[in-house]
Amino acid sequence: MALDVKSRAKLYEKLDFLGEGQFATVYKARDKTTNTIVAIKKIKVGHRTEAKDGINRTALREIKLLQELSHPNIIGLLDAFGHKSNISLLCFMETDLEVIIKDTSLVLTPANIKAYILMSLQGLEYMHNHWILHRDLKPNNLLLDENGVLKLADFGLAKAFGSPNRVYTHQVVTRWYRAPELLFGARMYGVGVDMWAVGSILAELLLRVPFLAGDSDLDQLTGIFEALGTPTEETWPGMSNLPDYVSFKLFPGTPLEHIFSAAGDDLLELLKGLFTFNPCTRTTASQALKMRYFSIRPGPTPGPQLPRPNSSTEALKEKENLLIGIKRKRDSIEQGTLKKKLVF
């Protein structure tokens, strides 16, 4: 007999607060029946003007995509249920790439990095072949299961593409991973926005810190151009026609081999393709997977042999998240919006 919503919610023990966005809060939890670790994404139901039949459109889109997409490197939806003013989506998870990158006790070998990027591109190629943009790729949206398999997650901003005249919002992708065309306000774009984000994630894996971490769109563009050089109409046709375009000083940029001194020629070729300013000629997922970088030694590390987060690092992250959770509760009390009991 199928369990009712309240009984399904009680199957999971909440362990840790992982993060919060504009539309959702994510928790780490344990399935009491199987003892497996899951991620629970609680999507807030919006106002009537933002909802359809009481369900937030973002939630509907994410549930629909997770049900339609089936690939080893895309997160699977275990369950979805509504309770009070939230919709909960459940997915398997052990950790995410951000935890791995920040754990300085771990050594990321060239083979490890190749494995992470290979799995990211395989999942992305599948999405793009099915005419779906992710639009929010970043390390903590790349989950890793207990077998070391990387899975693209968080499809709250994912969108179908393909219509040549379709207009989208440019306020997508976390700023540090946002492509220049988005920073210049482009309303029509394609797979290039995801590919730039992959380049930024690859750079972060190599450097162990975010490659370009601007605190505003203008600051982000300045950092990009200082590092990679300022594009021109010759290198990026149509750039000056973008809605929020502003002219920049002509920075010469720094050769990528000086920024990523340990990278070989094949890896530098991939980075250059991902960091191409003209989105029309930026390397696609399918093109990237055919590059020599993935066919030469070392081969990608098998999933079970990839590094696992240090328990002390996980504990530190849990402590940080606990402090964030306390601040959220304090803010809620001050605003008079704290619920008596937090439920799934």
From Swiss-Prot:
SMART domains registered for this protein in UniProt: S_TKc
Any single biological process term in GO: transcription initiation at RNA polymerase II promoter
Gene3D superfamilies, per the entry: Phosphorylase Kinase, domain 1, Transferase(Phosphotransferase) domain 1
A matching Pfam family: Pkinase
Limits of the Protein kinase domain: 12-294
Class of enzymatic activity (EC top level): transferase
Reported regulation of activity: Phosphorylation at Thr-169 is required for enzymatic activity.
Signal sequence interval, chain numbering: none
Main location group: nucleus
Protein name per its UniProtKB record: Cyclin-dependent kinase 7
Highest classification ranks of the organism: Eukaryota, Metazoa, Chordata, Craniata, Vertebrata
